[in-house]
Amino acid sequence: MTAVLPLPHPLADPAPRDPRQRLQREQLRLGKRLQRQVGQAIADFGMISPGDKIMVCLSGGKDSYTMLDMLLQLQRKAPVPFTLVAVNLDQKQPDFPAHVLPAYLDALGVPFDIVEQDTYSVVSRVVPAGKTMCSLCSRLRRGALYAYAQTHGVTKIALGHHRDDIVATFFMNLFHHARLAAMAPKLRSDDGAHVVIRPLAYVREAHIAAYAQARQFPIIPCNLCGSQENLQRQQVGKMLQQWDHEQPGRVEQIARALGDVRPEQLADRTLFDFLALGRSGDAPPDLAPDPGAWLTASDATHDSD
């Protein structure tokens, strides 16, 4: 007689996942992604050397908070030793919550300095009402931070510009200054005295915003220039957002193109010797007429018409 096995009980529905656990996992993945991108940028451009004293410029915005957080995490497992000091420039803007950053940095245990310099009054006095303050404010802020770096033995100055900033700057230079230029991930200042690094060069702004929200950084809004409407950078930013919406990945493609420059396919005579094209080996330069002769011939042809 064949035994009849009892039918198995139907499987109970699995317990629903705790949304808090899912959120924590997503935040963990995002944090690891940002760490990987920051580490890659540091490696690709040689941003940090053994013994560096890095001044982390902290404005109170999402970008600089994220940059400091990433550098602190990487510092614990970095292949070379380096130190960090967070520096905020108190520009004496009205209603600026001066207590926020010291309280946050004290709780974090990070060495920091607050540099007080009333650039707000200067900008407000010099820039006409209704005009953009960003350019002058940026120059004054940069001068104050460079002066601090000079007197405190800083070897690298870390700024919180991200990938979207770099691409937007490229288009601003293209549209308004007729030049192909963006923000270098690493550069030497114009006076040659300082090395500036941008550890967030590979990180998208949307990911920074999500990370800052997850970490609940005490964000301080900029009431000086951040509130001005119709700024060129905002307009370019909206254009890039629209492009990314219409064709996801387009901004990433543009960013990668900045690292694949081909001078022979452009028209900058200082970067590529177009006059040498057509020579073979060590042949001497062609005995071509002076370029001015072509202009003279062109004018003569025009006159004869």
Curated annotation (Swiss-Prot):
Entry-linked CDD domains: TtcA-like (cd24138)
One of the GO biological process terms: tRNA thio-modification
Domain of life: Bacteria
Alphabetic keyword roster: 4Fe-4S, ATP-binding, Cytoplasm, Iron, Iron-sulfur, Magnesium, Metal-binding, Nucleotide-binding, RNA-binding, Transferase, tRNA processing, tRNA-binding
Binding annotation for [4Fe-4S] cluster: 134, 137, 225
UniProt-annotated location(s): Cytoplasm
Pathway given in the UniProt record: tRNA modification
Composition bias, Low complexity: 282-293
Cofactor(s) the protein needs: Mg(2+); [4Fe-4S] cluster
Region (Disordered): 1-20, 282-305
Motif extent (PP-loop motif): 59-64
Enzyme Commission number: 2.8.1.-
Reactions performed catalytically: cytidine(32) in tRNA + S-sulfanyl-L-cysteinyl-[cysteine desulfurase] + AH2 + ATP = 2-thiocytidine(32) in tRNA + L-cysteinyl-[cysteine desulfurase] + A + AMP + diphosphate + H(+)
Cofactor binding remark: Binds 1 [4Fe-4S] cluster per subunit. The cluster is chelated by three Cys residues, the fourth Fe has a free coordination site that may bind a sulfur atom transferred from the persulfide of IscS.
Gene3D superfamilies to which the protein is assigned, alphabetical: HUPs
Single Gene Ontology MF annotation: sulfurtransferase activity
Any single GO CC term annotated in Swiss-Prot or TrEMBL for this entry: cytoplasm
Note, other: The thiolation reaction likely consists of two steps: a first activation step by ATP to form an adenylated intermediate of the target base of tRNA, and a second nucleophilic substitution step of the sulfur (S) atom supplied by the hydrosulfide attached to the Fe-S cluster.
Sequence similarity: Belongs to the TtcA family.
Function: Catalyzes the ATP-dependent 2-thiolation of cytidine in position 32 of tRNA, to form 2-thiocytidine (s(2)C32). The sulfur atoms are provided by the cysteine/cysteine desulfurase (IscS) system.
Subunit: Homodimer.
Name the record gives this protein: tRNA-cytidine(32) 2-sulfurtransferase
Origin species: Xanthomonas oryzae pv. oryzae (strain PXO99A)
